[in-house]
Amino acid sequence: MIEQINNFFTIEMIYLWLNLGVLPFWIILFFFPHSFMSKYLVRSIFPFMIFSFVYVYLLYYFFISDFNFKNNFTLYLSLENLSDLFSENGFLIMFWCHFLAVNLFCGAWIVSDSIKLSISKFLTFFPLLITYFIGPLGLFIYWLIRIFFARRMSLYD
């Protein structure tokens, strides 16, 4: 049975499911940020548990296929080493899973913070869209909106 699971969940299939699987969470954040679905499905631990299970499966998958995990630590030594790591599908899919999880976490935080500060969902739509594609820039745009509409500037929560 494990062999069948390994044959079905190839790297390409996991990549496809990661990209399609994150879309419903983002759609809920975009269009229904104040709903119970948003509160209990997106702004909870649920999506990040899914990402964690995928990540653990990927670690298992690469562990049994003799992936060189020690090589991952060389990414901090030079830009060329990082570039070499991104040429490996194993590292690339783990990075992509991490990237999707962090951006979704940032989007969920934006929605939670905007609800707490009573910032309109129409004002948070654009920063959420930017966060979906470019996480840090979307957070910065939301922070600028937060300064003007929440009438307070705070560098920490």
Model-derived features: positions:
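Short aromatic-rich membrane-water interface segments that cap or initiate transmembrane helices
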Residues: N6-I11, L79-M94
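Alpha-helical transmembrane segments of helical membrane proteins, especially in multi-pass transport
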Residues: E88-G107
